[in-house]
Amino acid sequence: SHVAKMAGLRLPIESHILQAFVTEPVKPMVHHVVSWGAELFYLSQSDKGGMVFGGHIDGFNTYTQRGQFPRIQTVAECAVSLLPFMSKLRLLRHWGGIMDMTPDGAPFICRTDIKNLYFNGGWCYQGFKATPASGWTFAHTMAHDEEHELNRCYSLDRFAKGRELDDYGIGNWTYKQ
């Protein structure tokens, strides 16, 4: 949103930290991604054997990439509740990434009021999974200077026009699940 501000745009986006963790390596035992939707928790095992897991945002705006201890504890508790053997593993490292969150949990894939300036952001937790389809519709938007029919609802003016998307439980409002 700092770059957008330089262009004169005010974006309805908050920046939150999402932490991830990795344990010491163990023999292969988790062959799929394990997720717990109610806790926004996920876990998988890396090729080197470490358990990679994370979940939940810290709950306040920040650009820092270091996590807070209460969230570390909460996410570790989720890991142990699902897979009790995790309590025996040592945590090797953790890191945080910045999530750009919109109030309704849906991204922006659109033109702006500034000529030749387009915006694709506010993906909350879902950006990586949605990249192929959103990239295709965003390319169409840029090439034709008009939104593709599949991304028309992801406009910057949807809040001003009262057209929020009913995507609760994904963005900042995780308690609505």
State each model region's role.
Residues 1-31:
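Central helical "cap/lid" subdomain
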Residues 2, 6, 78, 137:
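Alpha-helical scaffold segments in soluble metabolic enzymes
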Residues 10, 25-116:
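Active-site lid/adjacent beta-loop-alpha segment flanking the redox-cofactor pocket in flavoenzymes
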Residues 16-17, 75, 105, 150:
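Hydrophobic alpha-helical segments typical of transmembrane helices
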Residues 37-38, 80-177:
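C-terminal catalytic lobe of FAD-dependent flavoproteins
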